[in-house]
């Protein structure tokens, strides 16, 4: 007699990482660190009053059904730069959607720079990403999210897939910025439209929320001249949108813009070209 084998759920990558910082003797110091599953956080040495955190997905990428949760709390007066060890790769999904959720709280006179490296979407991948940020009235926040539709140098094309990116940025409980991006099914055809990406396969959004938004605008606009994109500032926030033919071209522009929004400070070392 033959017995049918019971269906088994493929093993999925899951992880949760939490970082909290406090101000001690004029420097940003670790208050809490928690890491679980595929989520790891490393804290390289810094030579100023700030803290740098490098978040790592030890699974090496994400596919349908994987889930990562990150949270960051910057206490009063602290400064934290958060980046990733490498580009996050989103692979073909046989079933389900990968999920990445990030929660950031920035306290009084504190600043967080959320600077992950690019996310690479492969053909038939599926990702839902969510960023929730709560800012104190006096806090500053800088975020960049860059997307590559495959790797152009490898001849990769993303014909179809699913990508949802949702941002909710609040200051003192009041919503000040929202993003709701969705790419689905005919991704290549959608990206080819002039009103979307005009055939470009690398794109990014940068957001700065803080008292220097309007002042930064004059520094940023000359840096994006000649590129596909633009910059605007209003109501205490600055938004930059960019698109490029490939990831290398995009990164060259991003490094200049990010540095300008950090008062000339360089990007984290893992970002170097």
UniProtKB/Swiss-Prot annotation:
The UniProt entry's sequence similarity note says: Belongs to the UreD family.
> Which organism was this protein described from?
Rhizobium leguminosarum bv. trifolii (strain WSM2304)
User: Which gene underlies this protein?
Assistant: ureD
UniProt keyword Transport, yes or no:
no
One Pfam family hit:
UreD
GO cellular component terms given for this protein = cytoplasm
Query: Quaternary state and partners of this protein?
Result: UreD, UreF and UreG form a complex that acts as a GTP-hydrolysis-dependent molecular chaperone, activating the urease apoprotein by helping to assemble the nickel containing metallocenter of UreC. The UreE protein probably delivers the nickel.
Role of this protein: Required for maturation of urease via the functional incorporation of the urease nickel metallocenter.
Q: What is this protein called?
A: Urease accessory protein UreD
Molecular-function GO term, any one: nickel cation binding
Q: Name where it's found.
A: Cytoplasm
UniProtKB keywords: Chaperone, Cytoplasm, Nickel insertion
């Amino acid at each position: 007699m033959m017995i049918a084998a019971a269906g088994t759920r493929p093993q999925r990558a899951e992880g949760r990482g939490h970082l909290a910082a406090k101000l001690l003797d004029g420097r940003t110091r670790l208050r809490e660190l928690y890491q679980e599953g595929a989520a790891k956080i490393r804290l390289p040495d810094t030579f100023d009053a700030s803290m740098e955190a490098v978040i790592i997905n030890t699974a090496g990428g994400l596919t349908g059904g994987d889930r990562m949760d990150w949270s960051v709390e910057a206490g009063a007066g602290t400064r934290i730069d958060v980046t990733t060890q490498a580009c996050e790769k989103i692979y073909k999904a046989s079933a389900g959607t990968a999920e990445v959720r990030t929660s950031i709280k920035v306290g009084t006179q504190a600043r967080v720079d959320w600077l992950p490296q690019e996310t690479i979407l492969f053909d038939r991948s599926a990702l839902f990403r969510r960023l929730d940020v709560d800012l104190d009235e006096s806090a500053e926040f800088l975020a960049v999210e860059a997307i590559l539709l495959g790797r152009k140098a490898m001849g990769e094309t993303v014909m179809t897939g699913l990508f949802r990116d949702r941002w909710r940025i609040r200051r003192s409980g009041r919503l000040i910025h929202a993003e709701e991006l969705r790419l689905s099914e005919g991704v290549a055809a959608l990206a080819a439209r002039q009103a979307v990406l005009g055939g470009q396969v690398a794109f990014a959004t940068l957001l700065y929320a803080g008292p220097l938004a309007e002042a930064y605008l004059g520094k940023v606009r000359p840096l994006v001249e000649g590129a596909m994109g633009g910059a605007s500032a209003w109501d205490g926030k600055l938004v930059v949108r960019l698109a490029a033919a490939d990831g290398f071209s995009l990164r060259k522009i991003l490094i200049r813009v990010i540095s300008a929004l950090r008062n000339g400070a360089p990007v984290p070392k893992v970002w170097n070209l």
